[in-house]
Structures are given as C-alpha cells and as structure tokens.
Amino acid sequence: TTYNADGTVLSTSHGVFVGNNGEAISDLKPFIGASKAIVTDSKGREMNVERIMGVNDIYDVAKFKVSGKTIPLNVAQSASASGSQAWLVSYAEKSPTITAATVKNVETFMDKYSYYIFSLTVPENTNACPFVNSEGQVIGIMQPSTTSTDIHATDAKFITELQTTGLSVEDETMKKIGIPPSLPTDKSQALLTLMMAAQANDSIKHAAIVSDFINQYPTSVDGYTAQAQIYLDANDFESAEKEMETAIKKVENKDEAHYNYSKIIYNKEVYKNDIPYAAWNLDKAFEEINKAYAINPQPSYQHQQALITYAKGEYQKAYDMFMDLTKTSIRNPELFYNASQCKQMLKAPMKEVIALLDSAITTTDTLRLREAAPYFLARAEAYVTTDSFRQAVFDYTRYEILVNGNVNANFYYIREQAEVKAKLYQQALIDISTAIMLAPKEPTYYAEKASLELRVNMMDDAIKTATKCIELAPEYADGYLILGLAQINKGDKANGMSNLEKAKELGHVQAQAMIEKYSK
C-alpha cells in the first residue's frame, strides 16, 4: 500500500520478495506520487518500504527494499517457452488462489529478457501477483494489457536486476517517488549519487543517501563530510564538529579527514561568521589543514592554507602562496584568480589585477571554457574601474554567453551602465529594457532607462518611462527629476519645473541646480 504525503492511501498492489534482506519486486505505478509505502506479507506482518532499488517506466516495474528479513521466492533464470504451463499465484493470508495459465506468446527484449503474453481471465485484485513455472520459480509479475484482453508479465529476472546509478536522483521517474533511492553498489556511482543528492532539492532523500553512504563506506571521508555539511547548513555546528571528529577516527586516509574538516570550518567562518561558535575559528581551520599536510604534503592542501590565510586578511602572504602554487602540479586558473583578489585587497594597480585575470582566462582549458565565466566577470569589473568600458562590455558579454544567458536583471543593468559610458547607446537601451522585462517593478531600472532616453533625445519615450517610474515609486526623486527635464526639453516648462521642485522636495541633490539653470 502506498500513501500520499498527508497519510491517505494512494494505491494498493502486490509484489514478490526476491531476497532475504527485504528485496522485492512489483509494478511501478503505485509508487508514483507516493511519500511512503508499507508492505503486508502473507502472515500479516507490516514492513516499511525503505528504498527504491530500481525502476523502469517502459515496463511499469520497480524493485524496492523493505525493513527486516524476508523469505524470497526463487526467480527463474531461464525463460518459459510459448505453450508452456504457468500459474498465477494471488495474495492470501491463508491459502492463495492459484490460476493455471498457458503462455500464449513470448517476446524477447534487450536480447536476454522475456515478455510473456497470456490469454486467461484472472481473478480480481491480482495486479503484480507472480506467475510461477512448474518448478515454483517466478517468471514474471501480472500486468493487464491496456490495449487488449490479454494478460502480460514482465520477466522477473529483468526486474530483479534493476539498479540505481549515480544519476538516479535526477531521473524524472525517481523524482516522482518520495521514497529515497538505494545507493549504487559501485563506489564511483555511489560517490556521484552523493554529489547529485546534495544539488537536488530533496532534503529527505539527501539525508537518506548520506546515511547509506556512511553505512556502506564507513572508512571513506565523503559520507561524513556530506553529513557535516548538512549540519553546517542547518547551523548545527556542534553536530558538524562531532561528525568530522568521528571521520578522523574512522576513515582510512586521515589526511583527507583533516582536510575536509578544515574546509567545513573555513566555510562556516567565511560564509556564516555572523553566527558565533566558540570551538571554531580560522586558526582552527588552519590547524586542521596543517595536520593534513603533515600526513601527506600535497599542493591541494597548500591551496587550502592559502585560502585561510586570505580569509585572515594576510593578503600579501596569501598572494605569495597562491603564486608559488602556480609553479606546482596543481597550476590552474583558480590560483591566478585567487591571486588577483589578493592584489585588489592590497590596493595594487588595477593593471596588475587584470594581468592575473588574463592568466586565469588563458590557463583555462579551451574545452572547459565555461569554467572561466567568473574570471571574465571579474575582469569586466576591473576594466570598469580603469574606464576601459568597451573592454568591460566585451567581457560582460563573454560571461553572458558562457553561462548560457542565465543572468538576472541586475546583470543587464550593470552592463548597460558600462555601455552608456562606452557610448554604445543602442546596446544600452536593449539591456536596460531587458532588465525591466526581468524585474518590471524595479523603479531604478525605469529611471535609468528614462535617463538614457533623455540623453539620446528620445523625449517622448523618456516622459513615458519616467511617468511609469513615478507610478511604481511615488517617493522616488529620480523619476521626477528626469520627467521634469524631459518635459522642459519638450517645451512643457511649467510641468517640467513643477516636477523638478518635487524632486527637490524628495531630496534629490541635483534638483536645485537644474531649477536654477532652467529658471533663467
């Protein structure tokens, strides 16, 4: 029986145990939309469905695992032939109903599995009940045809061999099931699952996957780190601390445990430093990475040391560390980017910052150029500070392309300002219009557009845009100032002066000068 999130029954069906540790097979449909499921065996014992072990929506079948030990039926390893006898075994607490059947046809799929077709009238309420052969082995589970009166059965061997992969958490069918997927048996796939679960928006499944990973790989640091990150996200720093201390005791590679513990502390101190936790500080993070480096002196640990040094405000020292690392085996674009940030904090000439960002970009593998997106954005911002506005616009545009246009209204507003200073007015009008389209209730963008229209002598448009700005924000002085200037330039001096006075009342610093200029 499957249940909705509110506890109401979603669907009921049947299934077969195929393993000693709760492994079972059934049809898929009852699980779609389910938040939980409970299996009742032939003795009336109830067991929670803990994990979905695999699904196939084409054949509408699923493999899952329940809590507790189970007594399985044997699954046939060889196909039953057309014309052979089979028996449909329906569920019952005392004595099951057995219906004899003859295999009408057998279709082979995926070169090795069988899809059985029967012509028989089946008892009610037998969906997903097993068909067994003369040896009592399960050959498939019952599925009514959607197009004829025939009865179908998908090979039980196929269903028992269903399994999850590293991408199962992103599978569209799996997403419709509230019960967590099982962890793949292959460690590399399990690691991929762990990573994908952290990115998916399902905290219940994420927590289950992390727990399973720790149980399955108790000497690997990845599960403990993922659990500590969950605690960190919830501001439960004490639990995160205990989790990483457990990792240090249990994992095989102690250096990795100290390294990941350092990163957890660093992330808390950098991104959540407004929430105090006495046991942690940047010195503690540095202590942990030093322990890792003492066990296994590798450059990636030195990079963590440099990041902590930067976070402590020791910018020159951090710069030297980042630049030293560019001469090691881990030379990569991020190191030059880190170094550029140090130079900015040291108030170095902007040309030095730009040179380092140039290196970050040129060091990026051309096949992975999307990774250079933040470097183009940083260089665009650097160009703006040096009044190199056209170069800035080019880099903003490269950034937009590299992130597939996944930018917000503020991005277009910022690029528009660079375009105005570069005298690229047509592009600027397009960008500020795009910003308004993405954030139609932001008065700043209307004021910016009206100001630009005023600049390029589009007076009617400037009046319309400024009026819209005032409608959105009646207390926003910029709207009145620009509207007043546009009206004066259009020949409507009386209304224009009135709006300049309104801008002055609202505290616009330029309003008085404009009033004096146009009063003459």
Where do the PLM segments sit?
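Catalytic histidine site
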Residues: 1-36, 143-144
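Single-residue signature of alpha-solenoid repeat helices
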Residues: 206, 240, 278, 285, ...
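Conserved active-site neighborhood of the chymotrypsin/trypsin-like protease fold
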Residues: 19-89, 94-98, 112-113
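Helix-start (N-cap) detector for alpha-helical repeat units in TPR-like alpha-solenoids
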Residues: 221-222, 253-259, 296-302, 332-334, ...
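Active-site region of chymotrypsin-like
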Residues: 1-8, 66-71, 97-165
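C-terminal cap/linker of serine protease catalytic domains
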Residues: 140-205
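Canonical tetratricopeptide repeat
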Residues: 226, 260, 304, 338, ...
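Register position in tetratricopeptide repeats
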Residues: 233, 267-271, 311-312, 345-346, ...
